[in-house]
From Swiss-Prot:
TM stretches of this protein: none
KW ATP-binding (keyword) present: no
PANTHER family listed in its UniProt record: L-AMINO ACID N-ACETYLTRANSFERASE (PTHR43617), MYCOTHIOL ACETYLTRANSFERASE (PTHR43617:SF31)
Binding-site residues, acetyl-CoA 2: 243-245, 250-256
Keyword entries, A-Z: Acyltransferase, Repeat, Transferase
Annotated source species: Salinispora tropica (strain ATCC BAA-916 / DSM 44818 / JCM 13857 / NBRC 105044 / CNB-440)
Record-listed acetyl-CoA 1 binding positions: 87-89
Ranges of residues in domain N-acetyltransferase: 12-157, 160-307
Protein name: Mycothiol acetyltransferase
Catalytic activity: 1D-myo-inositol 2-(L-cysteinylamino)-2-deoxy-alpha-D-glucopyranoside + acetyl-CoA = mycothiol + CoA + H(+)
Binding annotation for 1D-myo-inositol 2-(L-cysteinylamino)-2-deoxy-alpha-D-glucopyranoside: 43, 187, 227, 239, 278
Broad class of enzyme this protein falls into: transferase
Function of the molecule: Catalyzes the transfer of acetyl from acetyl-CoA to desacetylmycothiol (Cys-GlcN-Ins) to form mycothiol.
A molecular-function term among this protein's GO annotations: protein-N-terminal-alanine acetyltransferase activity
Amino acid sequence: MNSTEPDSDRVTRTDRLNAPEIADVQALARAAGDADGADPFDEHTLLRLRDPHAPTHHLTARTANGTLTGYAHLDITNPTSGTGVELAVHPAYRRRGTGRALARSVRAAVTGPLRAWAHGDHPSAAALAVDLDYRRARVLWQLRRPLTAPIPEPPLPDGVTLRAYRPGADDDAWLALNAKAFADHPEQGQWTAADLQARRDEPWFDAAGFLLAVDPAGQLLGFHWTKIHERPGSARIGEVYVLGVDPTAHGGGLGKALTAAGLAYLRDQRGLDRVMLYVDESNTAAVALYERLGFARWSAHVNYQLG
């Protein structure tokens, strides 16, 4: 463990957090999300926060009395291609130099390229990125749609049927299809059995809402994995969590049919009235598909790179 001393708070780096420290970070994330309208850490980061074996560095900023004022998460799974970074400062302790101190500590802790996410694309994050020579490299859109509006009912391709995912029995086939469908995706396509199991262990997991498209021989051709977000004080919202189609099945309308089937499940079986999804700005085909299905842009999440 080592530390640096910024102007206001003490920034400390460690490879593992204990239970009280994890609780502090989770509370900070909730406060920042409530204040900013966008959660500062994605699901991947929150899962690794609790995993003592994850290849991760943690940077915490605290006042002299030990109050957590800021946190930065460094994912060092593949430092050659770039260390992943997510950072947040507690709303009550902003404009004190904490964010800049954490960002500088991140640079001091890493020798290779950096890939930092700014969820919500806030002006302060953009200004800090410019000051520290990061370049805007990638944008994810969050799109939303009311489920009270009519949902299209496009037909499935001939011979294709839908069924629910079977935990354990479908794992290998789904992982293979996921890797194939997201071969060019920097995160999703690299999922392992451990990544799948980690999501299955989460309270939100619902096998009935994990829809698989199969051909007459039982081979997986596509999937729509739905998720429901529940947060105290907020209305529930569904998510098109992961949607994938085998490249050999592209062009037959399977993606549209899977999307519609998942939306109908969230509305009819789970009683939801709204849904969201994330899509890369550069994936113009997917953006066009979702817009035709009634989705509209809600917020942006920006990836900044250095080195």
